[in-house]
């Protein structure tokens, strides 16, 4: 067997293995297992050929061993963690497949050059990326014979027509390091071929981007659409092509920055620092590390007018590579990645502190191996949207504990996965709180904040913070748009130091009540007569005192909400409160914006009631009632109380018309009818809500037999409650009765009577 045939078979094996990984994570285990069997079949055939003994023995053996282990793990269902599954499922992008780098053994991974075909073929279907409509260009296959890593040759690379100054600056910064290993890791195989794999870091992993050997060329022009140099050097243009392919717009480049692009090329930790007051960030530390080749540096201009740009020799919205710094004169030498035909902009220029106000960002990429021994990462999906109703406890949260007696520096890097939707609108943030055990933060003011707010619309966000000795923290991720993310953590503690998904402080969570306020039950605050119409719930703590956290979370952005908890008794179970009794309140906090939260310590066995209210009435909006406690699940129950006065309900309204009594005739149609009457006075004609300041007459109500005027229930006490008068009465016989409604003095206004009953009845 010829080597080119062997390489083609190996290429098909690793490609099929990547698809098997993806299918396994997608839940198509049977397909994945079948693909593994196909791989083993091919490898068994290869092992029997002469080629097996000609340098490929270990490669075939390593892939076979890995495939068989992967097959067994599929059967056991334990090959991938949740994070790894999401990472693999993030491989599909713009209809293309970009698998993570797979390590088969300590000597072999999927980027190895022997796992790519070597034959040069004329392809009918080329890897064509979109081109700018304004340019007359075409694609050609190129012979790539110059694979030099020589500094002098690569340092002449430049950007021409394509506006990707960030990428060219990033590649030039690696060249300035003279790190040939970083350059070699960008593309494979390093020989003339039709197919190449480029290794770029995005979507939480080093990923392999397959491209062909076609590049765009302009018709009737000496200008270039690709990265170029004075040499016949094409391999950097292939890496550029892979980079543009991943971003999705091809040669219609839509922008990036040097820090992000350098991260994609090297995995060096990116930091984007705004330049404020013409001062650079921590110059001494940065330049010391720059001299030791531990950081890569760049700088980006802000928006400049055409006149100012020409005058200063700065390009508007442009990234430059930083090549040196003079600590005495505070001058910085920059390298311009762009060369124009008329050479109106210099390739190298020197700036001073006085020029910094023309620049907007300082780009730093830190070599992780120079500053940290260990890295841990987790990939997850953010399904909810901040600023549109998402509350703190619904956001992804992670628990972190410093196990040492010393302060520890930890860096967190949050990566937003491609593709980017509504890029400029999406803000991301990392919030860190000091917590007792790294438990989930329910509301923002519950715990001490350990970092400052620094949200960004960048695809990457770096947060540096110092952990106190033995202190636990909770990391909260915030985003304005749903997306997939990877959170990376760099540390010097140990390989086993990780963060985990945060859990609630208490172990038992009562199923969340998803409810809503409507025009029927949005009663407003307790100073309104409709307060008792709000949604209400029974709480029963059965035998053990319990610690319980209760939260009310609304969908409102700009409305105040609250919940009140009242002491009750067994006889009140299933019945709604009829007045706001402050003496029975467990807590009486002020209304707060969008949510209310309380952490009750040692709530005693007994019966309680919750009333959920917004400060304003007549609102429409959803809310959730969350309860978490530390007692056994069956020790606490929460049930919603039905809002109706009875199974059957009728209403009657009348005007007082300067009188002080009114007779309402009604007929019970069945035996043993249980009636509840709710009498409400209104002083205003077109207003169905009374407030504390409104006049209310004292009223009372009694029930009589309509046939003989015999009293059924006499109520002698007068009542002027804001929430109205309630009368409960059991009527044994089906016949006609009178509800006599009286007020203390004659007057005006109207009275509304709601009647509820467990059996049918009629108002006459």
Curated annotation (Swiss-Prot):
The active site is at 165, 318, 336. Pfam families: Calpain_III, Peptidase_C2. PROSITE patterns: CALPAIN_CAT (PS50203). SMART domains: CysPc. Transmembrane segments: none annotated. Residues 95-368 form the Calpain catalytic domain. One of its GO terms (molecular function) is calcium-dependent cysteine-type endopeptidase activity. It is an enzyme of class 3 (hydrolase). Keywords: Hydrolase, Protease, Thiol protease. Its EC number is 3.4.22.-. InterPro entries: Calpain_cysteine_protease, Calpain_domain_III, Calpain_III_sf, PalB/RIM13_Calpain-like, Papain-like_cys_pep_sf, Peptidase_C2_calpain_cat. Belongs to the peptidase C2 family. PalB/RIM13 subfamily. This is Calpain-like protease palB/RIM13. It comes from Debaryomyces hansenii (strain ATCC 36239 / CBS 767 / BCRC 21394 / JCM 1990 / NBRC 0083 / IGC 2968) (Yeast). The lineage of its organism: Eukaryota, Fungi, Dikarya, Ascomycota, Saccharomycotina.
